[in-house]
Amino acid sequence: MRAGSRISDLKYKLMTIELLNLAKNYYTYRELAQIIGLPETVLSRYVKGHVLPTIDRAQNINRTLQKIMRLEGEIQQRIRFDDAGYFDNTHLISDTLLLERAVQHAVNAFAGMRITKVLAAATDGIPLAALLAHRLGVGLVIAKKNREVGVREFIEEIYIPSKTAIMISLFVPRDALRKGDCVLIVDDVIDSGETQIALTRIVQKAKAEVTGMYALVGMGSDWKSKIEAVTHCPVEIVLQIGKKPLAEVG
């Protein structure tokens, strides 16, 4: 077996054990034993790190847990809109256990793809992006709306959000992205797609490549064609929902 294959198998086994640990927050060992079809003692040894499953068993465990721990259902339960029709993401970005599951989902979705940086716009996408960058073992880059004192050079992208007359700038330190970087753009929600397009242009200005985009929620579908116009990277959305009409301000 090649070293690369052994490392890949080891990462998959560890990822499966992490998913099993997450499942322990929802199910008892007895329940998991019945669901997975393995003795409680075996599952306990996996969770405690005493032993790792074989790759075949890890794949079976992973597939089974993915079926019962449907991430989109958990996200759907946390969807909130205020009286004016604005999306409230508080229950998404503050739930670290949910974000850990989303990280697991993202790792599976982009398995085998080269990723050297994770890029997010401040601020709501940062919790998910930070956890995902840590799991992937790559650098985290944050695009901010203000220039930071102490940073000499920036890559700047200006965009105008739809239905507004406001110009928004995003700044990334020029040395944060390098030529040849493979960048995963991460956010909690994709709504109009304009933030993701601005981030894509920042990556392009750095002569790097957008490997993909990942978000917990996709609002409507208008953003899809907009993003496709600037990049043909894969876009992974956990839950797609329709937009709620905004209340008119009298």
What are these regions, as identified by a protein language model?
Residues 185-205, 209-211:
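Active-site/ligand-binding-proximal alpha/beta "capping" segment
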Residues 138-183:
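Short, glycine/charge-rich flexible loops or terminal/linker lids adjacent to PRPP-binding catalytic cores
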Residues 6-26, 30-31, 47-114:
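Active-site-facing substrate-recognition patch
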Residues 2-4, 9-12, 201-250:
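PRPP-dependent phosphoribosyltransferase catalytic core
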Residues 34:
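Alpha-helical residues within the helix-turn-helix
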Residues 115-122:
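Short glycine-rich phosphate-binding loop at a beta-alpha junction
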